[in-house]
């Protein structure tokens, strides 16, 4: 069967700290074009690789990877909220297949997800509920982090499973590219934040969640004025990364350590492993070609903003 892929940066700052209208129109046009291509493909199943930002996963249990057999979006930063349409039996079968392939994939029957999962479903499919989805969490912020090699192997395992389903499968990768927004770190946290990172942050009071979101908005506003206030975006790295993906050379990323990636492009750049997993997955379907490449550094969203599609040729 055929597969389609789309990888897209996300940002909670969309609608809160936006770039100039010209840039916003350009990005919206890119997303609209991707949405049209996906609609023409008419997927029967979505596999969504996405990270979390201490909204669903915490240090009480922090797996490198987790498949949501059931999942609910919390609606942070005004993103869509509600249950994701996960086909339970298919998700269970996927988990068993991935485990048999040698990848230790955690499962959750009540996975809580944030804008990292919700935005691509909203932007590219028109909502959370349009197509059955297998949501796959890839840890991108909480050390210790999975590396490129293991993430690639996860994508390959999921790709091999879905290639047997006789369905039109859409692989989505959500996150990146270079960026380092103000995300708390356990090693530097005070007692209150440590408690939140250990699990109490899963049910934040509305007032505290609003303060947290306002801190991110304020950081973006300062970053627009002075890009020395956060780790700088790295367009050179971002474009080199996208070229590796387009050329099917993702295995070369195995040699890039987590520490090196953080230093080059920022500590939240590890979200790009969702893109690696998606490209690894589609590679198991046979020959493919990329299309729709777009990139622009957008300080207002604290992100090197990228968009890239691929389709199988068989």
From Swiss-Prot:
Cofactor(s) listed: Fe(2+)
Highest taxon listed in the record's lineage: Bacteria
GO molecular function, one term: ferrous iron binding
Top-tier EC class: oxidoreductase
Catalytic center residues: 115, 179
Pfam families from the UniProt entry: LigB (PF02900)
Pathway membership, UniProt: Aromatic compound metabolism; 3-phenylpropanoate degradation
Biological processes per GO annotation: 3-phenylpropionate catabolic process
Enzyme Commission no: 1.13.11.16
Keywords on record: Aromatic hydrocarbons catabolism, Dioxygenase, Iron, Oxidoreductase
Stretches that traverse the bilayer: none
The keyword Iron belongs to this UniProt entry's keyword annotation: yes
Catalytic activity: 3-(2,3-dihydroxyphenyl)propanoate + O2 = (2Z,4E)-2-hydroxy-6-oxonona-2,4-dienedioate + H(+); (2E)-3-(2,3-dihydroxyphenyl)prop-2-enoate + O2 = (2Z,4E,7E)-2-hydroxy-6-oxonona-2,4,7-trienedioate + H(+)
InterPro entries listed in its UniProt record: DHPP/DHXA_dioxygenase (IPR023789), Xdiol_dOase_suB (IPR004183)
HAMAP family named among the record's database cross-references: MhpB
Subunit structure: Homotetramer.
Family: Belongs to the LigB/MhpB extradiol dioxygenase family.
Function text: Catalyzes the non-heme iron(II)-dependent oxidative cleavage of 2,3-dihydroxyphenylpropionic acid and 2,3-dihydroxicinnamic acid into 2-hydroxy-6-ketononadienedioate and 2-hydroxy-6-ketononatrienedioate, respectively.
Name this polypeptide is given: 2,3-dihydroxyphenylpropionate/2,3-dihydroxicinnamic acid 1,2-dioxygenase
The species this protein was found in: Escherichia coli (strain 55989 / EAEC)
